[in-house]
Amino acid sequence: FQKLIAVPLEMTGSHFTPVNTDGGHAPMLGGGLCTTLNDYIRFLKMIYHNGRFGNKEILKPETVQTMQADQVRNAVVAPGEYVEKALGQHHTGIYGLGEWRELVDETTGEAYQISSPGWAGAYPWINKREGVCGFFIAHVQGGSSKEDGFSSFYGSPVLSRTVSEIVGTNNK
């Protein structure tokens, strides 16, 4: 990670933490990234620009395209699951590689909004159609789902869509 991603992206405040600190443990990939908002935005911008950061190619465009392609064709997705509940769009092409394909063009099947939400309240997203990327962090006291129905896991995608609609390139 440091050599291939963090250093070329100038992510000076980012590293993965081990599962525990006793030694001999590999970094924890799911939820183990310690970073700053500025560093993470650099990563999102690189993905948005198909693997490029400034004049550097960090990932090949084909790699980003593969990450965002439907990896589990015709996945069984029950009505009312994450994408439909959060964004109102039911489709079975929700799984990319390390990314959720949240909003998909019905004609081409290409994802135009991707994300990688975490149950702990982190929600990075890219909306290619509107030219917007961002990162929400929500902290909810107690459990992740409240008696009034609020859930940071389902709430952040709604906020991302609202931000995309307000500041996106199609609205200027």
Which role does the model predict for each range below?
Residues 2-7, 12-172:
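Catalytic loop of the DD-peptidase/beta-lactamase superfamily, centered on the K-T-G motif
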